[in-house]
Amino acid sequence: MIANDFGLDFARIRAALKHDYPRAADMPGPGLAAGPCLLKDTMQLAAFNNNQFTLGHTSMMINEGLPMYVISRAEQQFELSEMTVGILGMAFKAESDDTRSSLAYKLRHILNFKAKNVLSADNNVKGDHSLIDEVSLVELCDLIFIGAPHKRYRSIQFTCPVVDIWNVCGNGVLI
C-alpha cells in the first residue's frame, strides 16, 4: 500500500528484493490474504501474551482495510457509479472453493455501494447462487477486480481494465 501510494509497483520492488537473494525467495506477494486463520491465530497468540500482540492486531487491521483501499484507488481512475464492476474469484485463496473470511466478499459488499452494478464469479465456489459464470463476467464488465488468484485467470484475454493486486495477469500490482 505504501509503494502504491507513491506510484510504485510493489511487484517490481519485490522482484528486485528477491533477485540474487535466496533469503527473500519466499517473500509473499500482495493480495487479499484472508481465511479463518489470521483472526484465529492472532487471537490465540494475543491470549497467550496478555492480549499484547500489537503486530498481529495491526496486521488484521491492515488486511481488513485492503478492500476499501483498493476501491478508493480504483475510484481515482474510474467512475465506478457508472460502471458494471466484476470480481473474479471469491474463494479466500487460489485453487480453493473455501470462502470463509474471504475478503472478496467484503470487496463486493463495498462495491455494491459504489458501483452501478456488481457481478461476481468463481467456478470453484458452489452454493453461492449470486455468482455467475466466469466467461459471462469477463464479457459483461467494464472493470474487473481479481478477488482470488486462480491459475486459470492467467490465460484470460481481458478486454477491460483489471485491478489485479495479486499480479495474476503479470502486469504488476500498481492501482
Indicate where each model-derived feature is located.
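Structural/interface elements that position substrates and couple domains in central-metabolism enzymes
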Residues: 1-175
